[in-house]
Amino acid sequence: MLQPARRKYRKEQKGRNTGVATRGNSVAFGDFGLKCTDRGRLTARQIEAARRAISRHVKRGGRIWIRVFPDKPISQKPAEVRMGNGKGNPEYYVAEIQPGKIVFEIVGVPEELAREAFRLASAKLPLRTTFVSRMIGQ
């Protein structure tokens, strides 16, 4: 699964996920992309599950790019622990997603195959997505 190799600080504040994606909002590497239209978080497990769904559907054809990286640690306290006594330990990593962000890209497969692969992948993600293709002249 994806996670940072090293971090300067183990824990991070919660923060607020606002605005729309100004970077990573167009198909850059492949011919087709999966664009999020919702705001939220994608965990490393969800990204990996979606990647596997795409890989299994396109079999050996095509090349896949993952355009998001889970670099934000989410901490949790153990079950049945009383409030207080500091912040919990980092349990997993998430990628903050704004509307318009491209999550996956693919090249080397027909459009219908890419569409179906992304449909299967979007079922693994908690956000609404849409299928996009590269603009002419890009």
From Swiss-Prot:
Q: Which InterPro entries match?
A: Ribosomal_uL16, Ribosomal_uL16_bact-type, Ribosomal_uL16_CS, Ribosomal_uL16_dom, Ribosomal_uL16_sf
Q: Where is this region: Disordered?
A: 1-22
Mind telling me which GO cellular component terms the entry cites?
cytosolic large ribosomal subunit
Compositionally skewed regions (Basic residues) per UniProt? 1-13
Which UniProt keyword terms apply here? Ribonucleoprotein, Ribosomal protein, RNA-binding, rRNA-binding, tRNA-binding
Q: Name one Pfam family in it.
A: Ribosomal_L16
Q: What disulfide bonds does the UniProt entry report for this chain?
A: none
Q: Which GO terms describe its biological process?
A: translation
UniProt-recorded Gene Ontology molecular function terms: rRNA binding; structural constituent of ribosome; tRNA binding
Q: What does this protein do?
A: Binds 23S rRNA and is also seen to make contacts with the A and possibly P site tRNAs.
What family is reported?
Answer: Belongs to the universal ribosomal protein uL16 family.
Indicate the quaternary assembly.
Part of the 50S ribosomal subunit.
**What name does UniProt use for this protein?**
Large ribosomal subunit protein uL16
What gene makes this protein?
rplP
